[in-house]
């Protein structure tokens, strides 16, 4: 991982609303590289529980932070905005290659492929880069006085759900995670000849086990997996097998690992979002605070 440098945060825009303030912020992730994000802060005095909201992929590289912030895209994906209305500080950053982090010449998946290949050649991988950027997002959230650094959750759909799983596994500042349609087993993906985003593939991971080994690293912290019964890109059988195999890591905290399956495919429906928000409430604000 790169050397941790000063965040050098800045605020480019501040918009007041009835429930609080939305800020367009940026912070340094590496030397010479900054990430842009939307931050929501409730109007009530804090510190508040906070949620890092990671956007989906959907091959819509023009969308990143703006979708969970409720400014563009699919209303099913407006979870940073919806959680802010429930009293959370929320942060929605652009992933590399999306929205304000698109390349000036290479477009869409061409740039995603370039970044993945470049990092493989350097002895790393795109997943490592994405995780570093998200760890810097946690640094930023924890430094905000409105947020309680001991009550930080992570939520994402699709790519966001995938990154929620990996980030929860490697950074224990994530007190609770929710992954919506974010993983299956690699075996299920390969058996079904299903391609995914480049960050999904970590060199050598299968030599140590499947995705259940990643999920097991989250224990004993609470983790909720939401799945679509007919999700065509994250087969349900592989999701079930992953959660089942990870339960040994949760032997002393069985109630903290849960899988819920909903009708439909690769979506984040209102019932799924409500289940996600209830899980976050349960662990981040048990007394309603």
Task: For every predicted segment, state its role.
Residues 3-46, 50:
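N-terminal cap/lid segment of alpha/beta-hydrolase-fold proteins
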Residues 48-49, 86-89, 149-151, 173-176, ...:
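Loop/turn elements at helix/coil->beta-strand transitions in domains of secreted/extracellular proteins
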Residues 49, 54-56, 227:
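The conserved beta1-alpha1 loop
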Residues 54-132, 138-139, 143-144, 189-192:
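Cap/lid segment of the alpha/beta-hydrolase catalytic domain
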Residues 94, 155, 180-181, 226, ...:
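Alpha/beta-hydrolase-fold catalytic nucleophile elbow
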Residues 135-207:
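Primarily recognizes the serine-hydrolase "nucleophile elbow" in alpha/beta-hydrolase
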Residues 190-250:
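The feature captures the conserved acid-bearing segment of alpha/beta-hydrolase catalytic domains
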Residues 198, 244-245, 250-289:
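C-terminal catalytic histidine-bearing segment of alpha/beta-hydrolase fold enzymes
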């Amino acid at each position: 991982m790169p050397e941790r440098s000063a965040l050098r945060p800045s605020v480019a825009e501040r918009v007041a609303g009835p429930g609080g303030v939305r800020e367009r912020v940026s912070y340094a992730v590496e030397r010479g590289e900054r990430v842009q994000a939307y931050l929501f802060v409730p109007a009530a005095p804090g510190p508040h529980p906070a949620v890092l909201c990671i956007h989906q992929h959907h091959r819509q590289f023009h969308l990143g932070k703006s979708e969970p912030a409720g400014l563009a895209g699919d209303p099913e994906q407006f979870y940073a905005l919806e959680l802010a209305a429930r009293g959370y500080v929320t942060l929605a950053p652009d992933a590399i290659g999306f929205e304000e982090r698109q390349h000036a010449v290479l477009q869409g998946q061409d740039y995603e492929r370039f970044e993945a290949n470049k990092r493989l050649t350097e002895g790393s991988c795109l997943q490592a880069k994405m995780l570093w950027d998200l760890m810097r997002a946690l640094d930023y959230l924890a430094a905000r006085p409105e947020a309680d650094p001991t009550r930080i959750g992570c939520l994402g759909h699709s790519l966001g759900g995938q990154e929620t799983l990996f980030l929860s596994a490697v950074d224990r500042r994530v007190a609770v995670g929710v992954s919506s349609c974010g993983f299956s087993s690699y075996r299920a993906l390969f058996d079904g000849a299903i391609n995914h985003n480049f960050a999904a593939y970590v060199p050598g991971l299968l030599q140590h086990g499947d995705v259940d080994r990643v999920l097991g690293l989250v224990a004993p912290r609470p983790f909720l997996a939401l799945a679509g019964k007919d999700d065509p890109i994250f087969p349900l059988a592989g999701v079930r097998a992953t959660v089942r195999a990870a339960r040994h890591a949760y032997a002393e905290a069985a109630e903290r690992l849960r899988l819920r399956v909903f009708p439909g495919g690769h979506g984040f429906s209102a019932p799924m979002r409500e289940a996600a928000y209830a899980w976050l409430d349960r662990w981040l604000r048990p007394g309603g605070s």
